[in-house]
Amino acid sequence: MKVRTLTAIIALIVFLPVLLKGGLILMLFSYLLAFIALKELLNMNMIKFLSIPGIISALGILIIMLPQDAGSWVNDLQLKSLIAMSFILLSYTVLSKNRFSFMDAAFCLMSIAYVGIGFMYLYETRSEGLHYILFAFLVVWLTDTGAYIFGRLMGKHKLWPVISPNKTVEGFVGGLICSLIVPLVMMIFVDFNIALWLLLIITIILSMFGQLGDLVESGFKRHFGVKDSGRILPGHGGILDRFDSFMFVLPLLNILLIQI
């Protein structure tokens, strides 16, 4: 418990100033987190980061996370690069004599999209305004807290025992309820330029998908037979273990709240 608490304190000391500062430093930090998360994901599937598929995947992350405001050429480059990488990875299945399979190629492409899009929206959301990124983090944290408390106090019905045996329906609902505290409080101090009832609906959707993101990452770990995605955060596991909910919440937040 002491190790877990100490890790959380150190992580906050490092991450919070970067998040508040935003800009280039957050973008570079997001890239760092994305590369670590990609390595964790590839390791689950026994694909080495410093291998041809690993390097191609890292290049995909590099391209897919390019700032969207850099120009229209970015989207064109991203599309053409993903097409090229698909052909290269599929060709490598033949060159490796199926030691690298078609499923591995699909896994690499999925990893690029899953990790790259999630962490791209970490700095993209911050660039839209500090209140948006704080909103996302608070929704996820209140959801996790509510799910834990309600699950411990009232949890009787398993939510998805095959994937995550400890999660309950009561915890899931409790997470949704607690997440609503965020818009109710933030609307007092921040103008989201949206009606409160609509923001409450968006919050519920974000809370639901945040919990789904947690389950998806749990599904990865259970499928590959690992307890944690990594060991870079003592007591907490890996980067994916800490950011799994955000992989779903941040892109969805941009679609539902920022871009409407």
Curated annotation (Swiss-Prot):
Give the catalytic activity. a 1,2-diacyl-sn-glycero-3-phosphate + CTP + H(+) = a CDP-1,2-diacyl-sn-glycerol + diphosphate
Note the SS bond partners. none
What InterPro entries would the database entry show? PC_trans
Per the record, membrane topology reads: Multi-pass membrane protein
According to the UniProt entry, its GO molecular function terms are: phosphatidate cytidylyltransferase activity
Look up the record and name the pathway of this protein.
Phospholipid metabolism; CDP-diacylglycerol biosynthesis; CDP-diacylglycerol from sn-glycerol 3-phosphate: step 3/3
From the record, give the transmembrane residue ranges: 9-29, 46-66, 70-90, 102-122, 130-150, 172-192, 196-216
User: Would the keyword Transport turn up in this protein's UniProt record?
Assistant: no
Family of this protein:
Belongs to the CDS family.
Key word rRNA-binding present in the record?
no
Ordered alphabetically, the record's keywords are:
Cell membrane, Lipid biosynthesis, Lipid metabolism, Membrane, Nucleotidyltransferase, Phospholipid biosynthesis, Phospholipid metabolism, Transferase, Transmembrane, Transmembrane helix
Stated name of the protein: Phosphatidate cytidylyltransferase
The protein's matches in PANTHER family, at most eight in alphabetical order, are given as: PHOSPHATIDATE CYTIDYLYLTRANSFERASE
Q: One biological-process term from Gene Ontology?
A: CDP-diacylglycerol biosynthetic process
Please give the superkingdom of this protein's source.
Bacteria
User: EC number(s) per UniProt?
Assistant: 2.7.7.41
The Gene Ontology CC terms held by the record are: plasma membrane
Q: Name one Pfam family in it.
A: CTP_transf_1
Q: Where in the cell is it found?
A: Cell membrane
Class of the enzyme per the UniProt entry, highest EC level: transferase
PROSITE patterns, alphabetized: CDS
